[in-house]
């Protein structure tokens, strides 16, 4: 009698993990850009916002507005159907994000006066190839010294790349 096959990871569970790593990559990049991460995966009855970040107070001579970014992260494989996730930000999705952001601001009135923007981060994820690149070994969290747009980072058999970060991607 053949021995039972080793359990295979659930596809949905694997996709969630890949999505979390994509979000973590964007958090690392935002931190490098002098943003402070306030919340991750904040959810309410209307939906979920992947990342909520506040710009650090500006230096003298810079724009004086501290901003609050509600960031939607789309992690996709190459050759996907939806322009690396950009087409998934439909008007309906934008409306859900808007309502979710409004509820977040109600729960955090100290942030309500900040300039708010809706940003979109597009992350590409593929199974690792043999191409030379920075390899990152992770336990639970993605820890990278530098994340750059269009620079691959290898994590647990996957290659991630922040393709684009679109500030103020949409307004309502």
UniProtKB/Swiss-Prot annotation:
A matching Pfam family: UPF0102
Classification via SUPFAM superfamilies: Restriction endonuclease-like
Single GO molecular function: nucleic acid binding
Disulfide bond sites: none
Family matches, as Gene3D superfamilies: 3.40.1350.10
Superkingdom classification of source: Bacteria
InterPro entries: Restrct_endonuc-II-like, tRNA_endonuc-like_dom_sf, UPF0102_YraN-like
HAMAP family, per the entry: UPF0102
Protein family membership: Belongs to the UPF0102 family.
Protein name, UniProt field: UPF0102 protein AM1_3954
Organism: Acaryochloris marina (strain MBIC 11017)
């Amino acid at each position: 009698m053949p021995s039972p096959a080793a359990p295979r990871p659930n596809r949905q569970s694997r996709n969630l993990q890949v999505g979390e790593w994509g979000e973590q990559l964007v958090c690392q990049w935002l931190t490098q850009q002098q943003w402070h991460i306030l919340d991750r995966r904040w959810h309410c009855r209307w939906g979920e916002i992947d990342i909520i970040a506040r710009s650090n107070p500006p230096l003298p001579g810079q724009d004086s507005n501290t901003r609050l970014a509600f960031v939607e992260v789309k992690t996709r494989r190459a050759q996907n159907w939806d322009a690396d996730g950009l087409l998934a930000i439909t008007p309906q999705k934008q409306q859900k994000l808007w309502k979710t952001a409004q509820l977040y601001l109600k729960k955090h009135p100290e942030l309500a006066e900040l300039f708010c923007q809706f940003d979109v981060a597009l992350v590409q994820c593929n199974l690792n190839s043999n191409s030379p690149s920075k390899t990152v070994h992770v336990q639970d969290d993605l820890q990278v010294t530098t994340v750059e747009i269009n620079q691959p980072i290898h994590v647990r058999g996957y290659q991630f790349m922040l393709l684009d970060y679109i500030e103020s991607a949409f307004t309502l």
